[in-house]
Amino acid sequence: MKSHKSVRLISGIVILSVVFTLASTAGPVMAADKEEAQGIVDKAKVTLEEFLRDKNYSWVNEHINKEKGVLIYPQVLKAGFILGGSGGTGVFLARNAKGEWSQPAFYTMGSVSFGLQIGGEAAEVIVLCMNQKAVDALMTSKVKFGGDTSIALGPVGAGAKSNVVADFVSFAKSKGLYAGLNLDGSVVDVREGLNQAYYGKSLTPIQIVVEKKATNPGSSALRAALKKAK
């Protein structure tokens, strides 16, 4: 009997140790993820403002507040499939019928090869969602550009007025210069961990973007920058 009691006691101690260990590490991990998420939001604002100031991307400035939504990636690596962490994570925001921008949801982007025409190591990327089909596609867990949805390079140059017929329209620059970044075949996926860290609970993109189940005041500057576009 004593041996059984000893086994139960030891088992209980082990379980408690595991619980305390998980509890002690969960806080710092969540805090680090939240800090990373806010950093991406802040960098997305900088990327957006750089595009809006650049006369070569006047098309973005003129259309961003007419379309359904936008993906903003502060940094996309030249090649290699990106599964989160540094370099391949951005934010998606949708615009409702009143012209109000949603809270950001976090997404990764990856491809076998992005093929930057100017040979840069990384690029800043903005992708406009031109219709409801594009927004609906992003509400699923994963989207492949050029699969069920079409994507095209956006018009570049001062005074560009070209009409583009596609679900998504992309723009990219590397070190401040135009980058002909072909995103056809790239995969965009929800980064659930950052969404949870940023809002303090597990949420789907629909709950964040459409149903407005949570807010984070840290996104206000980014949303204000979007609203300022023409």
What is each of the regions a protein language model found here?
Residues 1-8:
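N-terminal secretory signal peptides that target proteins for export/translocation
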